[in-house]
């Protein structure tokens, strides 16, 4: 009998979404979750995302698609742009969950996760880094 895989994915939603869009694509989050489960045996997928009140329907959809959404309050700037960087939350949650998973997948091309990747490698807990855009990612993740 095959051992049930117990790998978790930690997803930088902003990095994923922006890099997919910059390539002219729109990500189907529901199918991406299925892909993570079927291809990599991901039992839990944590999605780190800035919280915007008007996006409640999106968050409900993501939850129904089997993501565990971790929200960060966003800041709105005078020019109308919003900022909700979730890097610290992703690192912290990955370390909090460490005893609960076999291996982690990090979905991001952001070099801010270099120290996390190094730590997971030292603990033999890194399954893979999924980089949304192979042509545009931090050299720190090579």
Where are these regions (language model features)?
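Domain-level signal for Mg2+-assisted phosphodiester chemistry and nucleotide/NA-binding surfaces
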Residues: 1-86, 121, 126
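Residue-level detector of intrinsically disordered/flexible regions characterized by low predicted structural confidence
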Residues: 4, 87, 135-136, 142
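Short, well-ordered alpha-helical scaffold segments within catalytic/effector domains
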Residues: 29-30, 87-92, 114
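Internal catalytic-core helix/loop-beta-alpha segment
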Residues: 80-109
